[in-house]
Amino acid sequence: MSIVLAGCGAASDVRAPNRDATLLLDFRPNAVHTGIYMAVDRGFDTALGVTLRIRVPSSSSDAVKLLVARRTDFAILDINDLAIARERGRDLVGVMAIVQQPLASIIAQPSIRTPRDLEGKRVGVTGLPSDDVVLRSIVAGAGGDPTKVRKTMIGFGAVHSLLTRRVAGATAFWNAEGVVLKARRPGMRVFRVDDYGGPSYPELVLCVTRETLQDSPALVRATVAAISRGYEEVISDPENGVSSLLDATTGLKRKDVQRQLDAVSPSFTAGARAFGELDPARLRAWARWRWGKRRRIVTRELNVARAFDGRYVPPAGRD
């Protein structure tokens, strides 16, 4: 099985798309999105002929639905939700990694010393299929029985649900809700999926439909290049990256975003040659792990070469 390497072998299409495009986030705006907001703030998108419109999801299930309905051009998906969507016949393709490491975790009350302690307890989930993967993987990885956990739907309300003790734990991102919760309640536990048997993999991936990839390659190339430059700027100038996010959104506190960015920024390029790289070996390792009997999330093995196309990512060291 082969996969196109980032920056290699792409069919050349250097024409500017000269059009608007929508990009749907995976979650409420937070530090992991700073590069996207920086790209728009600095005009990296318009310089390449695309005007990006950033949209925030109203619910956890928005991304796949809106991509398939052609109501958004791009969407950030959890890599596991991409796998599930493809298994369900949705021909979506990951074209760029936003991070190179897992962000998934279970955040739990201070009394929960190990994920095994969540047996018989109420644990909040957003409703995304990938939440079940995270919950099963972490609890089973700690020697517990995931079927004994009482799941309850909380949407994107992990912070509130944990602070009010509505739940004993919740699936959430350690770099976002985890940072906020540990600052507000220092004893909170954070159980990361890669600490319980998971491999290193790009948690968040920029995705498009196969039709967009085939019909609008110039749009995909320009958007990926603009976002890549945005994240490169954030890595070199994190303070202004925070400002770009805060200037475009409401309800965020600078100190919280700065803490989140400090936590997540190493994940932007960890183990990669360039920002956004989709490494074939890493993707295959993730697919094999997910295909394991205890953590199966699809009914057949994922075709990595069809699910990802990394050739639009600018290579390291390009001007």
What are these regions (language model features)?
Residues 4-7:
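C-terminal motif of bacterial Sec signal peptides marking the signal peptidase cleavage site
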Residues 9-12:
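Bacterial signal peptide processing site
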Residues 14-164, 168-175, 190-192, 200:
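Short, glycine-/small- and polar/acidic-enriched structural segments
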Residues 71-76, 265-279, 311-319:
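Short amphipathic alpha-helical segments at helix boundaries and their inter-helical linkers
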Residues 80-81, 157-161, 165-251:
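Pocket-lining segment of extracytoplasmic ligand-binding domains
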Residues 214-295:
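Secondary-structure end/capping motifs
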Residues 284-319:
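Conserved C-terminal helix/tail region of periplasmic/extracytoplasmic solute-binding proteins
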